[in-house]
Amino acid sequence: MAKSKKDSGARRKKVTRTVADGIAHVHASFNNTIITITDRQGNALSWATSGGAGFRGSRKSTPFAAQVAAENAGNAAKDYGLKNLEVRVKGPGPGRESSIRALNGCGYKITHIEDVTPIPHNGCRPPKKRRV
């Protein structure tokens, strides 16, 4: 006979830390947009993607999908008391501009916008051009 697990009753309350300003990392590829909001040390507070927001296939790579993902990540990070955001954008995708606008619309003060797209000094051979 299985014993029932006894509930101790005293549960530890989860401590939420307050972070004044953080960094929003926007990774905008051609297929998807990933937004991660971190503190100054790089510890992730919240994240969201276009695919995780319910968009599938070619709709994942639209500016509207990036906007919805940025709103989801921004609203999830509000629990930490975030006020100021520094935005670092990486990649050539269509969600670059709209995700910044959506984070601004969430009520954050954007202090700095930086493009951190990696540029090769003639590194790997790029993929071949599409023939449609």
Swiss-Prot record:
It comes from Alcanivorax borkumensis (strain ATCC 700651 / DSM 11573 / NCIMB 13689 / SK2). One of its GO terms (cellular component) is ribosome. GO terms for biological process: translation. Disulfide bonds: none annotated. InterPro entries: Ribosomal_uS11 (IPR001971), Ribosomal_uS11_bac-type (IPR019981), Ribosomal_uS11_CS (IPR018102), Ribosomal_uS11_sf (IPR036967). Keywords: Ribonucleoprotein, Ribosomal protein, RNA-binding, rRNA-binding. Located on the platform of the 30S subunit, it bridges several disparate RNA helices of the 16S rRNA. Forms part of the Shine-Dalgarno cleft in the 70S ribosome. GO terms for molecular function: rRNA binding; structural constituent of ribosome. It holds the Pfam family Ribosomal_S11. Gene3D superfamilies: Ribosomal protein S11 (3.30.420.80). The keyword RNA-binding applies. Belongs to the universal ribosomal protein uS11 family. Part of the 30S ribosomal subunit. Interacts with proteins S7 and S18. Binds to IF-3. This is Small ribosomal subunit protein uS11. NCBIfam families: PRK05309.1, uS11_bact.
